[in-house]
From Swiss-Prot:
Belongs to the ABC transporter superfamily. Methionine importer (TC 3.A.1.24) family. Pfam families: ABC_tran, NIL. It comes from Staphylococcus aureus (strain bovine RF122 / ET3-1). This is Methionine import ATP-binding protein MetN 2. It comes from the Bacteria. The keyword Membrane applies. It is found in: Cell membrane.
């Protein structure tokens, strides 16, 4: 269990004070994958570096498995960092060491006997899919392979928490998915708690259980990924979801001719089992109306499917539209009116 209570981080410069993290409260379940998303400058990197005290909070508490991180002694903090490990965007490998020796490095620092350290490193090489590359140097590896070494090294001391600081940002889409699949496998095998920060909604959607959205140092929205993706509340969250959907439909709406009276353009959002139900055809029959599908999209999250439909209804009376909306609510389908005549 990880708890952040009223965490604040301020930086003082010559001319002003910068509030990088602004009274953040979070509760992260043990064994879950928790994502923090935000644009550049939102404060997410500063936030994650306070989990293992690479940054000290100006005020507030960071509590991991009952330990108040800011109250630990030097030796206590050193021991805790072995259990709260971290991987980085640019891998941070030792270029003069082979794959195997990079993975052995934290074990050497921890005083593990060489034979045991080597055996552990070989097991991790196999876990992350690098068997046969033990003697390769970082300069001989692809970006995805380097990140696999980084992950193996981070797992060397059997951590309970893995922090991922933009771990896939330097990778191409296919390699990103491979690394995300590896993180999922590791979480399941080792019951890790994973906290990752990113600016990509695809990453959040693919592996996270819950997400917090940051802007200007504040958490502006948080909750289960499916819920946040299905019903974003804040402008920033809506922008992330829109980018993930590649949705430029609202822009093209302005180019449409004015609608006739009693005509509507609506967006429906489906989740779970409703994504496979023939709702549009049944409503079209029930209300004897024509429904044109202007746009459709389905996205898979780790915990379920979310579907999006944009519909054009050429004519429906106000009374029937009210019934139409009520029936959608009963079927747990969300509706947003984009335009009406």
């Amino acid at each position: 269990m990880i708890e952040l209570k009223e965490v604040v981080k301020e930086y003082r410069t010559k001319n002003k004070e910068v509030l990088a993290v602004d009274h953040v409260n979070l509760s992260i379940r043990a064994g879950s994958i928790y994502g923090v998303i935000g644009f550049s400058g939102a404060g997410k990197s500063t936030l994650i570096r306070m989990f293992n005290h690479l940054e000290a909070p100006t005020s507030g508490e960071v509590i991991i498995d009952g330990d108040h991180i800011g109250q630990l002694s030097k030796n206590g903090l050193r021991a805790k960092r072995q259990k709260v490990s971290m991987i980085f965007q640019h891998f941070n490998l030792l270029w003069s060491r082979t794959v195997l020796k990079n993975i052995m490095f934290p074990l050497e620092i921890a005083g593990v006997p060489r034979r045991r350290a080597k055996q552990k490193a070989l097991e991790l090489v196999e876990l992350v899919g690098l068997k046969g590359r033990e003697k390769a140097y970082p300069s001989e590896l692809s970006g995805g392979q380097k990140q696999r070494v980084g992950i193996a090294r981070a797992l060397a001391n059997d951590p309970t928490v893995l922090l991922c600081d933009e771990a896939t940002s330097a990778l191409d889409p296919q390699t990103t998915d491979e690394i995300l699949d590896l993180l999922l496998k590791i979480r399941e095998q080792q019951n890790l708690t994973i906290v990752l920060i990113t600016h990509e909604m695809h990453v959040i959607r693919r592996i996270c259980d819950e997400v917090a959205v940051m802007e200007s140092g504040k958490v502006i929205e948080h909750g289960p990924v499916t819920q946040v993706f299905e019903n974003p509340q804040h402008t920033v969250t809506k922008r992330f979801v829109k980018e993930d959907l590649n949705d430029d439909f609202e822009t093209s709406l302005t180019e449409l001719e004015p609608l006739e009276k009693y005509a509507y353009i609506v967006r429906l959002v489906f989740a779970g089992s409703t994504t496979t139900e023939p709702i549009v055809s049944s409503l079209s029959t029930a209300y004897d109306i024509k429904i044109n599908i202007l746009e459709a999209n389905i996205k898979n999250t780790k915990n379920g499917t979310v579907g999006f439909l944009v519909l054009h209804i050429p004519y429906i009376s106000s009374v029937d539209f009210g019934k139409f909306e009520k029936e959608l609510i009963e079927r747990q389908v969300k509706m947003e009116v984009l335009r009406h005549g």
